[in-house]
Amino acid sequence: LIRKLTKNDYRVTVVTRNIHQKSYIIKTQANAGYIDIVEANIFDEEKIRSLFEKADICINLIGILYEQKKGNTFRNIHTVFPSILAKLCKEYNLKHFIHLSALGINDAVDSDYAKSKLEGENKIFKNFPLATILRPSIVYSVEDNFSTSFMTLLSRLPLFPLYYNGKTRFAPIACSDLTDIIHHVISKNIYSKIIECVGPEIITFKEILQKLLKLIDKKRILLPFPLPLAELSARFFEILPKPLLTRDQLRL
């Protein structure tokens, strides 16, 4: 996204929580003079507010798949923070606010993740009606977290569990296509919309795993798990620092 925007003559300010970890990667995405990197806690409202004084457009890409300690809850990240951004967009009369949400949240009524996303969308439109919200399916790219996590597990485990018999359907979208959509929304002045962003292929979870197995040249047993066993395994995964699966994700 940084490359796309700076190539089209936008100057970008990137806000990151860890400038020492991310700055080298970020700096390589644009020519000097087109990018500023700011380290900030997203709930330091005074620091965030200062960034709006010279901004025309705000793009929020922040989201989490599982909750952590230190305030990283679904509600804080998906509801409270986007609401703060929307209020600041209105206060500083920004031209646009583009917010990345998630596909399928209307139907996942039992998921805390989905409910927090949906509530965040509602608060955004209440505070800044001109906002445009993008709802992407799974986003993939080179070395993305989704693909690499599953490929690592598939390379190590002799069998892999299939939840809901692996029939859950996705329409994965390439990261480059999603960045094109974001640029299109900006350049064509698209306001007050919810846009669902999907790729050209509808594919099941089982088919995704089969494609990944082919990429790593491995053969594994894909074993359907009944829901009670799936929830039990999710409890185990939740113990890990970066859980591959949570009980809330089973409700999506």
What label would you give each PLM region?
Residues N145-F146, N165-S187, S192-E196:
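Substrate-positioning beta->alpha
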